[in-house]
């Protein structure tokens, strides 16, 4: 038995899991709600952090440091940068970067600060497990680079710039910060995103239309991973 954290940013990303689990308890802590359940001989702690890097950093830290999570699976949605990605497609991050971390005025590359690398890698064993699950379910799962920042990207020029600098396949607002916490605390991390939009013009309208279904796709996949851990 292990304790597994499942984290999302929005209620839409965690509610499908709670509806499946049904029997859970909850604890209020640090201005958020944490849900606890047993599933396939594992203890789960679930939460949605609220949107953004700071919120997700706080929740990931609480799940590991206070509640003892031994692995963290992030489930949610993202905007597609890679033209081969369609809405609803699943992407797991091999590595992530913060595209809005900017001290380029001092001659450093975008996404870099002293003491940190630009890219944070995720856990190879969890990534391989995800590929096994995808094969069993006959689901297409793509590996790629995710760019994280505190902005919803709905602009073609910004999208092109971030993709060019980081070779990013998708963008979102929490993954890199969660991966950084897990890396620092030596906890295996897996970041899964279902595409909800294409991060360009009118992306906000696609997001509103597809976020719920895309979030369910990601959530169901993560729960299947728990069965294999």
Swiss-Prot record:
It comes from the Bacteria. It catalyses: 6-amino-6-deoxyfutalosine + H2O = dehypoxanthine futalosine + adenine; S-adenosyl-L-homocysteine + H2O = S-(5-deoxy-D-ribos-5-yl)-L-homocysteine + adenine; S-methyl-5'-thioadenosine + H2O = 5-(methylsulfanyl)-D-ribose + adenine; 5'-deoxyadenosine + H2O = 5-deoxy-D-ribose + adenine. It is an enzyme of class 3 (hydrolase). Catalyzes the direct conversion of aminodeoxyfutalosine (AFL) into dehypoxanthine futalosine (DHFL) and adenine via the hydrolysis of the N-glycosidic bond; this reaction seems to represent an essential step in the menaquinone biosynthesis pathway in Campylobacter species. Also catalyzes the hydrolysis of 5'-methylthioadenosine (MTA) to adenine and 5'-methylthioribose. Can also probably use S-adenosylhomocysteine (SAH) as substrate, leading to adenine and S-ribosylhomocysteine. Homodimer. The lineage of its organism: Bacteria, Pseudomonadati, Campylobacterota, Epsilonproteobacteria, Campylobacterales. This is Aminodeoxyfutalosine nucleosidase. The active site is at residues 13, 197. It comes from Campylobacter jejuni subsp. jejuni serotype O:2 (strain ATCC 700819 / NCTC 11168).
């Amino acid at each position: 038995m292990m304790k597994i954290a499942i984290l999302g940013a929005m209620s839409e990303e965690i509610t499908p899991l709670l509806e499946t689990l049904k029997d859970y308890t909850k604890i209020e802590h640090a201005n958020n709600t944490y849900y606890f359940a047993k599933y396939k001989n594992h203890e789960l702690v679930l939460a949605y952090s609220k949107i953004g890097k700071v919120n997700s950093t706080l929740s990931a830290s609480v799940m590991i440091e206070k509640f003892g999570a031994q692995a963290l699976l992030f489930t949610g949605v993202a905007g597609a940068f890679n033209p081969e990605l369609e809405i609803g497609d699943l992407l797991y991050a091999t590595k992530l970067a913060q595209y809005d971390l900017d001290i380029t005025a001092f001659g450093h590359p975008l996404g870099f600060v002293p003491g940190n690398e630009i890219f944070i890698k995720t856990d190879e064993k969890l990534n391989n497990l995800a590929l096994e699950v995808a094969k069993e379910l006959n689901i297409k799962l793509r590996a790629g680079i995710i760019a994280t920042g505190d902005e919803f990207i709905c602009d073609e020029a910004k999208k092109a710039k971030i993709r060019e600098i980081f070779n990013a396949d998708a963008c979102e607002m929490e993954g890199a910060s969660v991966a950084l916490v897990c890396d620092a605390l030596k906890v295996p991390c897996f970041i899964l995103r279902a595409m909800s939009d294409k991060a360009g013009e009118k992306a906000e309208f696609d997001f509103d239309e597809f976020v719920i279904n895309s979030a369910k796709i990601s959530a169901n996949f993560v729960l299947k991973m728990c069965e294999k851990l």
